[in-house]
Amino acid sequence: MTVSHNHSTKISQQPISSVSAFKFFGKKLLSSSHGNKLKKKASLPPDFHSTSTNDSESSSPKLPNSLKTSRRANSFAHTTNSKRSLSSASTKILPPAGSSTSISRGNRHSSTSRNLSNSKFSSERLVYNPYGVSTPSTSLSSVSTSMKKDPDLGFYLHDGDSKIRMLPIPIVDPNEYLPDEMKEASIQLSDNFVFDDENKTIGWGGSCEVRKIRSKYRKKDVFALKKLNMIYNETPEKFYKRCSKEFIIAKQLSHHVHITNTFLLVKVPTTVYTTRGWGFVMELGLRDLFAMIQKSGWRSVALAEKFCIFKQVACGVKFCHDQGIAHRDLKPENVLLSPDGVCKLTDFGISDWYHTDPHDLSSPVKKCAGMIGSPPYAPPEVMFYDSKKHYDTELQQPYDPRALDCYGLGIILMTLVNNVIPFLESCSFDTGFRDYCDAYENFIRLHDRAFRNRGNYRPGPGMEYHLARNFKNGHASRVAWRLADPEAATRYTIDDLFEDPWFQGIETCVDANDKYVCKKPIIKTTTYENPRGFHIATDVAATTPTSNPFLKNRVPIRSMVDIAAHPSPTATVLASSPPPPPPATHVPAEALFTLRETPPPQLATLTLSEEPPATPAPSAPSAPSARVRGHSPHRVVHHHLNIVNSLVHSSSAASSQVPAST
């Protein structure tokens, strides 16, 4: 108790900084009962005294090697535990109990400050390091500094995921990879579009992400931007070829009622939400088919509506095959529903021309080899190429890509009716698929030995079979099972499907022969300088719709350079420019995958929007229908669609989605 009294008296005689230190360590002093511990607890940190370093060096004694080692270890402690490390360091430098060596309080703390100032942290200069990636290693780190490498810029642009690669600057002009009839006057996204205020990702996949964009000139016009990313160890040239091929196929298949329209291939700049690259400006869908099937209310949807959706998807597939293109990745995620209930195919990332000569539709069929598509909807002949299954190479035979699409149609029909996918993989390792194959053979052996023969329209499996129980119609189950035939040689083709009497009798909500009127984006700003003296405000006035009478006859504001070059606002040199070449029927094969070394030629014409489709002849729908307000009179809605729309609008606010390629 005497030691405690004397010590407290000495502390009270210290300057104000020592008194504040006493308050800081007050709880420790009151809780201590041992004299030696009390003496150690009263040591102050170096921040509360002002003794010079030179004086402390002259008065501080030499310490044993063991104490030096412990002091050096404490100097490398983390900065967040600085108080604890200082306390332990000052405790370790005290002489043992009963020692005759006396160390003054000032010298003791100045020695601690000197030792810490000689540490590695104190001797180095401060470096601006906001991300903390250049911090040198300490005794707490198990990896040496020489083994660490600073990440590149992509590390920060992708939230630390350095595996995602970015295209080098400058981004290549998309017109260098497009045929002449598909070249664009505007290749910059920022020329005519802005990102939606929500800035949400509405779709994503392994090679892309989808966001909403709006027109600069009409905010209510909303479109989808499919931002494409590099995959695996893809080189920039392979990336450009892959994306341009997908755009050419999607553009070729546009203008059909059951195909999602693709408008532009543009360059996307680096923003807060996206990285630089290429992107598609596409029609925005309301919801994909998979999101509707997984809702609990889908079970109550009538079979007539499900069959209507199936027929719309089949019409889209048939149109692709008629154009010489195989989709090769059919699944509910790649089927979009428009606001008026029309089903549309999307995502042509792995689609391809299935003729040896894409220009000649009568040329032989080009077969495929390798693992393509999604396992639940890929046929058995494709699953033989799965490296994880280790199938015998003799089973890996080239296959017709059209048969792959037909098999996917059969699985989609089963999924629509049964509300779940029938099995996970179409291979012998999946128990569900093995049961399906056994049931298939049992039905042929016990009920209909001619089930696989062409032209046989007898009823298919009934209630006794698990995957045919919910069809409640033998003819409907026949179509589903014939499309999903495990044997590719006897599987239904797209022509066999459209010749089936049951399929022909399905009532649909839209006629596939009708022209779908889709709102196209307004293009006012061009990327290139037009060589024919194009004046944007003058030429666009006749094609830009407006309801404001004050804007119709408004004289545009012109710069002095424009006035000097063209004194008359309507002066053009159309006579000197050659007429544009007629559009080609097919895409030149050499233009699809050839990189031009010269810059793109100046565009002679400006495409403000695609040519409006010809007005089709009125055709009566094949089922009771209702007109859609504000749309073409030929666009009708099925009488069962109100159930589907109730499922769509019951979702969350982020209901618009365009599936991305996987």
Swiss-Prot record:
Annotated source species: Saccharomyces cerevisiae (strain ATCC 204508 / S288c)
Protein name, entry field: Serine/threonine-protein kinase PTK1/STK1
Location of the Protein kinase domain: 196-503
Residue numbers annotated as active site: 329 (proton acceptor)
Keywords from the named record: ATP-binding, Kinase, Nucleotide-binding, Serine/threonine-protein kinase, Transferase
Function recorded in the entry: Essential determinant for low-affinity spermidine transport.
Gene Ontology molecular function: any one: protein serine kinase activity
Compositionally biased region (Polar residues): 61-91, 98-119
Coiled-coil residue spans: none
Catalytic activity: L-seryl-[protein] + ATP = O-phospho-L-seryl-[protein] + ADP + H(+); L-threonyl-[protein] + ATP = O-phospho-L-threonyl-[protein] + ADP + H(+)
GO biological process: G2/M transition of mitotic cell cycle; spermine transport
Gene designation per UniProt: PTK1
InterPro entries: Kinase-like_dom_sf (IPR011009), Prot_kinase_dom (IPR000719), Ser/Thr_kinase_AS (IPR008271)
Statement: the UniProt record of this protein carries the keyword Nucleotide-binding: yes
Enzyme nomenclature, EC number: 2.7.11.1
Gene Ontology cellular-component annotations: cytoplasm; nucleus
Family: Belongs to the protein kinase superfamily. Ser/Thr protein kinase family.
Low complexity bias spans: 50-60
